[in-house]
């Protein structure tokens, strides 16, 4: 019985430590959440919460361009394709942090590969995506 209690305690400790390792204020977490919303779910509104400055302006322009299509009932879920992304690099640029991502987008009959450069700045103690550059690979 003591062995079982110790195993349960160790399992609980491992789960607690694993969940604590996800620092939701870290720039990696913010960048990954932005990429998940913007590229994988194709949901500019959800991605917007992770942005500031130029990235927010970019999303506002995209939301304005898609407003009429969305008003007709076309949703982000319908727009979403099968998207796989992988963070490949982290670089400092002055006070900012840049993350590179490889992004693969599979449509019904084709596949696209893109490279995304996602730059974050610490604005009032919160990391925000401030610039996004996407290139075909």
Task: For every predicted segment, state its role.
Residues 1-19:
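Sec-dependent bacterial lipoprotein signal peptides
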Residues 20, 26, 59-63, 117-121:
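A general secondary-structure boundary signal
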């Amino acid at each position: 019985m003591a062995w079982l209690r110790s195993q349960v305690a160790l399992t609980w400790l491992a789960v607690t430590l694993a969940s604590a390792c996800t620092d939701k204020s870290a720039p990696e977490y913010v960048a990954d959440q932005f990429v998940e919303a913007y590229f994988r779910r194709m949901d500019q509104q959800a991605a917007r919460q992770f942005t500031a400055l130029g990235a927010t302006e970019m999303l506002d322009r995209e939301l304005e361009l898609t407003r009429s299509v969305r008003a007709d009932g076309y949703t982000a879920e319908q727009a979403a394709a099968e998207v796989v992304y992988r963070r490949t690099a982290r670089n400092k640029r002055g006070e900012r942090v840049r993350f590179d991502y490889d992004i693969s987008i599979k449509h019904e009959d084709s596949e696209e590969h893109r490279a995304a450069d996602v730059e974050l700045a610490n604005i009032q103690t919160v990391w925000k995506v401030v610039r996004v550059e996407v290139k075909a690979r």
